[in-house]
Amino acid sequence: MEDYLEGKSPAGVAFYREFEAVALSVGDVVLAPAKTRIGFQHGRIFAAVNAIRQGRIDVHIVTARPIRSRRIRRVESLGASDHVNHFSIESASQIDEQVIRWLRAGYRWGVG
């Protein structure tokens, strides 16, 4: 995982670390780092940080139903109960109760 973070912007890494702490707090979550992203797994990978950029991180959370929010950039529906919800985090204040609810929904999806 440290290889993935190496060379990334300090601000982006700080957002990642905050998101990671919140994602790990929703339950029995395992980090699943890969070459192009860092996943969060509970059964299945239910969330991932797909990019760490200067001043933002790009994230997705998989849920049983599409998330209806202006914060969601795009939803990929892979099946009746598999919806990949993409959004960005551009400030620490955006890692809020709404994101925690989405992570909990993803966590439940992970063992579904």
Predicted regions and their residues:
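Charge-dense, helix-prone N-terminal extensions
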Residues: 1-112
